[in-house]
């Protein structure tokens, strides 16, 4: 067995911007492994179930816990320790940023999907890689067996800063479609009891899959950024176990839906950095989901003051150093789970 399959992550990192060759391996249990590119592995059971599952990591290369989880699941599949019932596509999205140990090399990849990679005059390898990721997702979903099928995409991340709600997921804008009760239960089984509802289209990987392919797709934040080997894997055990169950079991049983177990937030404000002189009005170590009250100053964008518009307005993803025109701060307010349009 060559290095492609003996150590898929290491081989991927050796080919950080891609590999033109493809590789195939059929396991003794009949499962077919197809490597389409560095970091791109399709797993096809001999008799696939009705689900098509995309598991992506390393859109940001320093978010190592999801990379370790995907690495271990892949290794166990190859060693035939992990059964696979449903077609699964693993994507290690940005290997060059893994090697650099940084969030990205030149540009934030999670702002480059839904065709954003081709807009404007800027061109770089991250944009090229994002375009390839889109193509691989399309190829995977479009090559599924005929019949009634369900599509899933969980884009796994960890956050830069601490969070008062350690694990949370971003539910892409649904364009008026109802939310999935079963997906909230799946996330809860992963240890993710907090969900943020996007209120508009975005250029994230999960929104791309949701919008273009009607997939159940989420950006899943599983904790905080740590270097390789320093993640407390016990904190990620529920997520890893549930992801393993997703690809191995025909159906998952979550029991009755209990709204009070879920903490749901919707966007209140998106504050973009439009001026070079942008400053957040709180310390760098203030945690995600810290609450502010109406009228409290959140940031200065040049000479424009940005205030909280609601009592109980929580901050998410503050980053004063983003590129001009990008989001520097998101704020959210809680909404009752019972108020959602759920199916």
Swiss-Prot record:
Gene3D superfamilies: Zn peptidases. CDD domains: M14_ASTE. Pathway: Amino-acid degradation; L-arginine degradation via AST pathway; L-glutamate and succinate from L-arginine: step 5/5. InterPro entries: AspA/AstE_fam, AstE_AspA_cat, Aste_AspA_hybrid_dom, SuccinylGlu_desuccinylase. Its cofactor is Zn(2+). The active site is at 221. The keyword Ribosomal protein does not apply. The keyword Zinc applies. Zn(2+) binds at residues 60, 63, 157. Binds 1 zinc ion per subunit. Its EC number is 3.5.1.96. It catalyses: N-succinyl-L-glutamate + H2O = L-glutamate + succinate. Pfam families: AstE_AspA_cat, AstE_AspA_hybrid. One of its GO terms (biological process) is arginine catabolic process to glutamate. Coiled coil: none annotated. One of its GO terms (molecular function) is zinc ion binding. Keywords: Arginine metabolism, Hydrolase, Metal-binding, Zinc. Belongs to the AspA/AstE family. Succinylglutamate desuccinylase subfamily. Transforms N(2)-succinylglutamate into succinate and glutamate. This is Succinylglutamate desuccinylase. It comes from Idiomarina loihiensis (strain ATCC BAA-735 / DSM 15497 / L2-TR). The gene is astE.
């Amino acid at each position: 067995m060559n290095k492609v399959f003996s150590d898929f992550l290491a081989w991927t990192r050796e080919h950080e911007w891609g590999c033109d060759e493809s590789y195939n391996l059929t396991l003794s249990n009949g499962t077919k492994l197809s490597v389409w590119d560095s970091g791109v592995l399709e797993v096809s059971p001999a008799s696939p179930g009705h689900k098509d599952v995309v598991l992506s990591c390393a859109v940001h290369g320093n978010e190592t816990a999801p990379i370790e989880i995907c690495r271990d699941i892949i290794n166990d599949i190859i060693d035939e320790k992990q059964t696979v019932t449903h077609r699964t596509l693993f994507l290690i999205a940005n290997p060059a940023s893994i090697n650099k140990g940084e969030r990205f090399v030149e540009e934030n990849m999670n702002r480059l999907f839904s065709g954003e990679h081709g807009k404007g005059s800027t061109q770089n390898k991250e944009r090229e890689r994002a375009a390839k990721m889109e193509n691989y997702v399309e190829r995977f979903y479009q090559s599924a067996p005929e019949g009634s099928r369900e599509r899933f995409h969980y884009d796994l991340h960890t956050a830069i800063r601490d969070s008062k709600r350690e694990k949370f997921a971003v539910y892409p804008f649904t364009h008026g479609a109802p939310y999935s009760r079963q997906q909230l239960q799946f996330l809860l089984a992963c240890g993710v009891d907090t969900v943020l509802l996007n209120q508009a289209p975005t250029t994230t990987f999960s929104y791309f899959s949701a919008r273009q392919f009607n997939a159940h797709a989420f950006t899943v934040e599983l904790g905080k950024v740590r270097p390789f080997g320093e993640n407390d894997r016990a904190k990620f055990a529920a997520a890893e176990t549930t992801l393993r169950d997703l690809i191995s079991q025909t159906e998952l049983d979550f029991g009755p839906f209990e709204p009070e177990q879920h903490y749901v937030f919707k966007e209140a404000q998106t504050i973009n950095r439009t001026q070079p002189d942008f400053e957040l009005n709180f310390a760098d170590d203030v945690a995600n989901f810290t609450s502010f009250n109406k009228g409290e100053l959140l940031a200065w964008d040049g000479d424009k003051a940005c205030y909280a518009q609601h009592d109980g307005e929580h901050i998410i993803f503050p980053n004063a150093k983003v590129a001009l025109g990008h989001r520097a701060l998101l704020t959210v307010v809680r909404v009752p789970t019972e108020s959602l349009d759920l199916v």
